[in-house]
Amino acid sequence: MLQKKMLLSEEASDDTWRSVWRDFCGKDSMGSQIVGKQSIAFQNAVYIAGSASVVGPKEAAGPLGEWFDVKDGDPLFGKETWEQAESEMQSIALQKAAEKAKLELSEVRFLFGGDLLAQLTATSFGIVEAKRPLFGLYGACSTCAESLTLAAMSVAGGFAEHAAAVTSSHFASAEKEFRFPLGYGSQRPLAATWTVTGSGAFILGTKNGYVRISGVTPGKIVDRGVRDNMNMGACMAPAACDTICQNLLDFEREPQEYDRIITGDLGTVGKEILLQLVKDRGFDIETQYMDCGIEIYNPETQDTHAGGSGCGCAAVTLSAMILPKLRKGSWKRVLFVPTGALLSKVSFNEGQTIPGIAHAVVLEHV
């Protein structure tokens, strides 16, 4: 029956395909959670039961320093290499999040995690001792939202009672991976951002949570031809615009229906580009807008130029600042939109452009 209906037209609209799918599956199926062109509204409640943030000394000295769970004055975290230090942060964050959720890691069915390093080195070694099934993810600095999205889908779909999302970044390991060795002393342009040394972990479940994930809008890859790896904000802003506008259209909301629309690490340069791009699409989000990369450092005293970046930037800010405000009811609904620049050493050295991606998670006060 489904195959017959699908053959009727190769150019059917999204609404037509959605109707066919619902007829085939039944109105009580997971298909009925599809919203608009690329969003999902969870009918079965998904809650954040626990979260944790682990940061290095520079982040601890910033404006959000007092709110982080674990602050280490040693950027090596007692290890021998930067990569090992990043793995240690993930291990600590995941264990701390489970403790705050009053769970053993053995009760977490699936882990969704990733980082910025080749072959997800920090994640592979960081959570090996957890001994839980892992889905390794690479979404660059959007990985926090990507992991939350997939973890929420697994919980809402009944595939796991509890799932965890974890990600990290480290200034030194990222510089080593994508730019120049620290000893080289390369000068940074003002459009550059500072990779956050930090890890955030989140435990999702069907009950006993304090913030609800009510929906998600997975993002598309958007490439506007930018090639400057020292201006990540310009690379990622078009993708952020695309996802934010699609979320508003899919859920039929106005920007003011969110207390905050928060991107991950566009920084001061990307912020201005995003606000103009969104305005060109017919929305004004300036009143609600916030960026984790702008919040996490003081550029005047910490010499971070355009702001913070990295997978850890959005993750630790979500855990330390955004979730507590939602929990207290200071904010009722937040659109959380981490952004990622999808480059590698190979693609950049071959002269390729730097595409961007952004995933959106709708967070609500319980």
Spans of model-derived segments:
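A generic, well-ordered mixed alpha/beta core segment in the N-terminal half of proteins
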Residues: 124-176, 180-192
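Conserved "HGTGT" condensation-loop signature of ketosynthase/thiolase-family condensing enzymes
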Residues: 1-8, 15-112, 116-135, 200-366
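Generic beta-strand structural signal
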Residues: 161-164, 197-202
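Short Gly/Pro-enriched turn/cap motifs at secondary-structure boundaries
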Residues: 191-195, 352
